């Protein structure tokens, strides 16, 4: 269980786990988008060899996007919506937020691909490479600090292959986050749908 936990206290916030787990050799790190995928990932983990960390949020499980339930394949992300120009790649609990952002942007004339990362480690490098063909802006979204997290690894991948695609990382600040209502904390940290939407529009206007 990880991510922002609200009123339990600032030392209970699980915001560094993706960073330190990614450092462990042979470790597989997964994050489900909803309760159905959590069940599927548990079954996948039981039938797999090697260590697997399965990250899920505190609180009631999200039951949206239930129509998207592609088979889990090791190291592969899930394509939820396929469009052009902007690609949103979200981890775990932020898939719900990214879906809301995509719907709002679409109403304003911005087309967005939406990808459920599923795997934080290993990265789906095949998908990341394919995105550069039809997208100018790649946005990563995670409920973890940027340093050592999913977004930083995605940015490093594009830098290593010499891609000129623009990458925006949506993540938590590198700091201890005070206790409080989770939705309020998300807004204060800039990972709520409204704030993310504004950042993407500003970046997209400059493409």
Task: Report residues per predicted region.
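Conserved thiamine diphosphate
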Residues: 1-47, 199, 205
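Thiamine diphosphate
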Residues: 4-14, 47-207
